[in-house]
């Protein structure tokens, strides 16, 4: 189960005891559903939900206690595996840059090289070794100082295909293909994270939750997930976000999940299938002929689980997200509850 910074903000408190009680309740809900692993945000916007030497304390949680210490303790007390979820490239909102004072992101702001503004947010540019070194150091301190079971990143790689984002670094590279340049940078980022995680604690696993579309990963995110699955030194598991229905015109679920199964199987790594309850009861406007499937069809999540567990490389499913399961909007709440009950019955 993914527990995002948005979910954590709902239990934000300056009091450690109140935060501990809130996260305990969330974990209890997860355990009752049959969840055995939680993927919890510890860096969402160039910040830290723990005591960090490299990033400032998140604005989303008050107080001076150590949130990560509490979150790991309460997870393990319930037999839940805890994976620290970081967004490596996404930085803070432009309006929040003063919070980075005293840290590298503040020093790099305004230069438009190592930290680049995209819309209302800053993003780190992985073209520079000092940037990937910083990201790796942030991962290493987590695994060295906390009893986390894994480190987990999602699909926030390059935030734009526009050339302005890394034009200076690209022009200095001597390469002719911007795509090849960016793919290589993401390769270096992921391999650096893998090495840093293992250096902090050799038993900690590292995985990537990329987009469900291979085409989008390669051409828009510049994430060569095929290479990461096939070659050692990148990831211990792959967790694609296969947030598609069975009737999706471009990426029908069964076709998509089988493609990922083949990639994972050939690389000898587990496939954890990311599914979502966030679409239940809503139109999926990018699904083509299947745009109404999440409104009209029943037991989609259960059927996705049943299809996934038959795969040779199956390592589990992951559900996005805690809020969409346990705090669904009133307009779809009864539908979500029914669908989750069916999924729970199938899993247990």
Region locations from a protein language model:
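Active-site-adjacent "subsite" loops/lids of carbohydrate-active enzymes
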Residues: 1-20, 72, 83-84, 89-145, ...
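Catalytic domains of carbohydrate-active enzymes, especially glycoside hydrolases
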Residues: 21-47, 145-150, 231-238, 308-317
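Polysaccharide-binding and catalytic clefts of secreted carbohydrate-active enzymes
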Residues: 19, 69, 109-231, 243-244
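Aromatic-lined substrate-binding rim segments of carbohydrate-active enzymes
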Residues: 26-27, 44-90, 173-200, 252-253
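Short, acidic/polar
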Residues: 9-31, 131-142, 216-233, 253, ...
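Acidic-and-aromatic substrate-binding clefts and catalytic sites of carbohydrate-active enzymes
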Residues: 9-21, 43-48, 61-62, 212-221, ...
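Hydrophobic faces of well-ordered beta-strands that scaffold small-molecule active sites
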Residues: 1-3, 38-40, 82-86, 151-153, ...
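Substrate-binding cleft of secreted/luminal carbohydrate-active enzymes
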Residues: 232-252, 259-348
